[in-house]
């Protein structure tokens, strides 16, 4: 660990699983086990989740073309959404917002997208600040450009009836 006392990470993003980890000295880990409030509701990863996480790590290490395709998709969608005037914030991951800033509209837009067989999550208060409601877009390496373009086209159409 060197000069860093603690490293935390999640398996729910790039690994596509659940759970997370803490890497630290044995002494700090013991302290966290006994005194971290969040540990009360924690449980060990199931064997299935552990196997999935290990397989995801293997794919990340041995299949760089998957990561390359992911970032090609992410960059394409970011560019297209920005060209169409959508506020996508400043996230640097494959999961990023499309800012709506209205709780009611977020759910209306998500429903309209779902009718078009496009799934995005609506995120509202208290998960984000008031007036920071957003759609959460998760770009995958398995998406094709045509699918990303369908999202952009749908959002442009929906914005005509639900301005955001």
Where do the model's predicted regions map?
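A non-catalytic, amphipathic alpha-helix used as a structural packing/dimerization or gating element
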Residues: 34, 55, 62-80, 150, ...
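Conserved core segment of the aminotransferase class I/II
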Residues: 6-8, 15-64
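PLP-dependent enzyme catalytic core of the Aspartate aminotransferase-like
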Residues: 115-118, 127-164
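Conserved PLP-binding catalytic core of the aspartate aminotransferase-like
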Residues: 68-77, 82-117, 127, 131-132, ...
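Cytosolic Rossmann-like ligand/nucleotide-binding regulatory domains
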Residues: 123-124
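Phosphate/diphosphate-binding loops
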Residues: 3
């Amino acid at each position: 660990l060197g000069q860093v006392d603690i490293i935390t990470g999640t398996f729910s993003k790039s690994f596509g699983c659940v759970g997370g980890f803490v890497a630290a000295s044995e002494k700090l880990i013991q302290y966290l086990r006994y005194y971290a409030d969040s540990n009360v509701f924690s449980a060990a990863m199931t064997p299935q989740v552990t196997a999935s996480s290990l397989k995801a790590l293997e794919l990340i290490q041995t299949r760089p073309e998957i990561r390359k395709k992911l970032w090609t998709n992410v960059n394409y969608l970011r560019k297209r959404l920005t060209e169409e005037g959508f506020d996508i914030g400043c996230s640097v991951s494959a999961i990023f917002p499309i800012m709506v800033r209205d709780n009611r509209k977020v759910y209306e837009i998500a429903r309209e997208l779902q009718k078009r067989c496009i799934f995005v999550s609506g995120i509202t208060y208290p998960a984000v600040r008031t007036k920071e409601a957003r759609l959460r877009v998760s770009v995958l390496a398995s998406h094709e450009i045509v699918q990303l373009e369908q999202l952009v086209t749908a959002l442009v159409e929906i914005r005509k009836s639900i301005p955001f």
